[in-house]
Amino acid sequence: DNDPTNGGVSNCNGGCATSWPPLLVTDGVASGVADLASITRSDGTEQVTYAGRPLYFYISDNTVGDTNGDSPTGTWHKVDYSQLYAPLFDNTSVLEPDTQYETADALVTRWSDRPRTRHAREDQFQSYDHYVKFYFEDRSTSIEIVDYVAKGGTNIEMNVRTIWPLNATEAENRWWYAGPSATYHWNSIMDYMGSEVIDGTTYYHYQKTGDFYRNANTRGIQMGDRLEFEVSQFSAPGITNGQLNYYGTVFLYIVGEGIVPWYAKTGDEASEKIPEEYWLGGDTTIHYQYSDEPNDNFLQMATNLGYDNGQTFLLGRRVHHSSFVSGAHDEDPENGVLSSNAGLTGPRYINERCSDCHERNGGASVVANGELLDRWVFKVGDANGNPHPNLGSVLQPKGSASEGNVSIASWTESNGLRSPNYQFAGVTPDTFSARIAPRLVGLGLLEAIVEADIEALADPTDLNGDGVSGRVNVVTDAVTGQNRIGRFGWKAAQPSVRHQAASALNTDIGVRTSMFPSLDCGSAQTNCNGSAPQMPEENLDTLTLYLSALGVRPQRVWQNGVADQDVLQGRELFRNIGCVGCHTETFQTSEFHPLAEVRDQTIHPYSDMLLHDMGPGLADTLSEGTATGAEWRTTPLWGLGLAACVTGGVINPTGAEGGESCTPHHAYLHDGRARSIEEAILWHGGEGQAANDAYQGLLESDKQLMLRFLESL
């Protein structure tokens, strides 16, 4: 114990360091625990310090939990520490069942599906990716494939479970794609296997088994065969609401492997597996869209949605699309009223549905000057950045106690870029931050990224000298009081999907939950909570599952079975000019996340989940927690190239079936100021300035390649 008590230096070198190995840091920063730092040792290595004093291992401590060095003579002491943040999930987390497992004689894959109006390749109808009327009433399906071929057997068994019985003469299960469009080699009615009651719900079971490839006159099934199939969800008469006849999702099962996202080959449109490097959302990745419904890209179930989660997903979607004022569904009045949503809003709010801001699960649009920004969120504060006494922390323009509204008065143009100037009607806050609703896809995957992997990317003091100094936003868990890494929101203010959903319900819709039981309120305001009850816990559960299990489209680089070289060249330019300094390509998600859909997946979000100072050009006047006005969380880029058609929607000039076309609306960055992806790049300042400068230095042809890459995401 020869180090000075005031720390700052290690006197343990040579033989001492052999017996008392120093705890070293190799990635430039000691982190994860409060009061950690580092010193430079005599050999040039960086040693971790705690409260200024160097840390060592004792040579007899070999495994976690060893305390041999805690000497009664005082030559060694264990260090008690407080963790900087608590992980969301660890080895004590309760895990939902895996979507795939092995038995002694089979590979078993289990997942969920929903009804479709038409088939995946029928662009003439544009009716595959939308949601049918009453999608939430007894119309989810669970599918199980028992693959005996994978273990040396000869047949494949497919079991289908429904909540409403299928029509005995139309419960068709089509196997082995033949083409064109929706034609299969083997169409047959599934065998009815009986029903069972689980937790008060009656389930109906159907089965199809086969041991031949395509048809009975060919060979047997072999490893690697591509079994494309589609289950007809034709309901038996008597279902409460809606039509009886529906189709299902087109799935591709690779014998011996599992369900995979697919592309349609040029010519016969036969399905093939998309290379895994283009599965942006890991196993949640859905197939390419061939039904020409560009506004519906962000609405889809994860391909690997859990066997027991299909109905929960659909019920959560209903919560998302139903008014918290009247309970009415926004897509079709025939979908009726969700009574458990009705009457939950307090005296003030921004909008009455989640989908009113996140239309089609995309971002909000930028409206004309003078029009109310009623799909935006304005965080507000007093001169010191604290909640405004007359407004609270968020401007809420609707309800019986409206706080006023805001619109864009004009734009300031400079060098081809524009920034908005706002006009408030009512109280003008001293400080504020304008936010459009972000895209919702991939949220569960972002929640599943391991905290240590996020923190490993942080370099708050720019030790490596690359000009990028991202940092984690450590926030307080509103439920447990623990410190956690913030992940969601423009400034990473919430740690989980559930926290983010409950926070938005509170400030944006004026709905109280068990997580946030008190509504937003300024010190000079009264009757903030009103008399509305809290949101039912079950509805918050289903909404969280829905938001967590939305599928991600694959990178659009392989639609025709050959890699688009322009996209790949653009990817190299993106890497080479430094964009990946913030837009991290790849993570492996946690093995401890409760949801199998997002657990232990390789994903490509193109975000480091860190806060970065983006310079004065993008700064607002309001901080949020520890995030300054100039700091923003790196936005994930998956879905970027699809966003304009989702936000803008479609028009149908003729009204004829199949006549819809995209009306793109380009609105990028936190306030939608960027009218193109290139403008968004050119707005990058601060830590993003070097990459911006490098982009501007590219040849025009190289700029177009890089934009092509970004549009492919």
Model-derived regions: residue spans:
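Compact beta-sheet-dominated domain cores in extracellular/mature segments
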Residues: N2-L84
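Periplasmic c-type cytochrome electron-transfer domains
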Residues: L84-L713
